[in-house]
Amino acid sequence: MSNGYEDHMDDVCRDDIGRTNLIVNYLPQNMTQDELRSLFSSIGEVESAKLIRDKVAGHSLGYGFVNYLNAKDAERAINTLNGLRLQSKTIKVSFARPSSETIKDANLYISGLPRTMTQKDVEDMFLPFGHIINSRVLVDQATGLSRGVAFIRFDKRSEAEEAIASFNGHKPPGSSEPITVKFAANPNQSKNMALLSQICHSPARRFGGPVHHQAQRFRFSPMGVDHMSSISSVNVASSASSGWCIFIYNLGQDADEGILWQMFGPFGAVTNVKVIRDFNTNKCKGFGFVTMTNYEEAAMAIASLNGYRLGDKTLQVSFKTSKSHK
């Protein structure tokens, strides 16, 4: 998940705007800013409505802010619209708070969850520790099954710290393996490679099954986890501003961009795919590149797809480095 919540609140909440500013979570992915404004205008006069989008890819991050002219309208909007079902989403409406150090860096990364746990199950498990701003369970879009990874953003860092202290290494109901609960990595920090190394060698990765696209003609089969160990030694050649570039090697001659979209799309937002082709034959030369906007999602894609078989080829997937093909 993005740090858009804190970034946006830094911009819009420098002044005390009282009890008129609302944060709206779990919006449908295709909902527009105009539709957001229209929905909340049915309650009262809206001063501003802002749908938060990814700064690189431009897609909705699933939440936004609505500021009313009248505090009573804001309170009525919470009472009326909180819990409203929109498409497949149940939106959450609550007061937004001005940015402060107490709410910075309160985003948690959870891995090793039972695949049967839903987003509501995860929220219910962490709710005793404080107010949850938003949450997300990573799901394979082809099968609809959980990948056992989630992100939860608390209202305060202290609440997130308490959740880590209580649940990191804990075995939730229905799991024979302990889960990992830690602060989500900031792509600008040097810790990002440590996170990737942990993902690649975690118990959840060893015991988790492969990603299967049953309805498609491509099927992935896992190799030994040791085959992925080389990922942790590379230097990431990317940045949060340009996205995270992933290098895919050993593609078949018939591979095309559609295959890469199918492979990496279930893991998160993909902004660009490119298959490198022979100039004369227009056949794939055996490698390609995928750019993803979110570091954690890119790392999970690498950990899941490196060493998998596509047709008769075993793929090598890693962050692009200066030594990768150009």
From Swiss-Prot:
GO cellular component, one term: nucleus
Role played: RNA-binding protein that binds to the 3'-UTR region of mRNAs and increases their stability. Involved in embryonic stem cells (ESCs) differentiation: preferentially binds mRNAs that are not methylated by N6-methyladenosine (m6A), stabilizing them, promoting ESCs differentiation. Binds to poly-U elements and AU-rich elements (AREs) in the 3'-UTR of target mRNAs. Acts cooperatively with cribp to stabilize AU-rich sequence (ARE)-containing mRNAs. May play a role during gastrulation. Required for the vegetal localization of vg1 mRNA.
Protein keywords: Cytoplasm, Developmental protein, Gastrulation, Repeat, RNA-binding
SMART domains hit by this protein: RRM
Family per record: Belongs to the RRM elav family.
GO molecular function: mRNA 3'-UTR AU-rich region binding; mRNA 3'-UTR binding; poly(U) RNA binding
Lineage: Eukaryota, Metazoa, Chordata, Craniata, Vertebrata
UniProt-annotated location(s): Cytoplasm; Cytoplasm, Cell cortex
Record protein name field: ELAV-like protein 1-B
NCBIfam families the UniProt entry points to: ELAV_HUD_SF
A Gene Ontology BP annotation from the UniProt entry: regulation of stem cell population maintenance
Assembly and binders: Interacts (via RRM3) with cirbp. Unable to form oligomers. Part of a ribonucleoprotein (RNP) complex, at least composed of elavl1/elrA and/or elavl2/elrB, igf2bp3/vg1RBP, ddx6/Xp54, ybx2/frgy2, lsm14b/rap55b and, in a subset of RNP complexes, stau1/staufen.
Organism from which the protein derives: Xenopus laevis
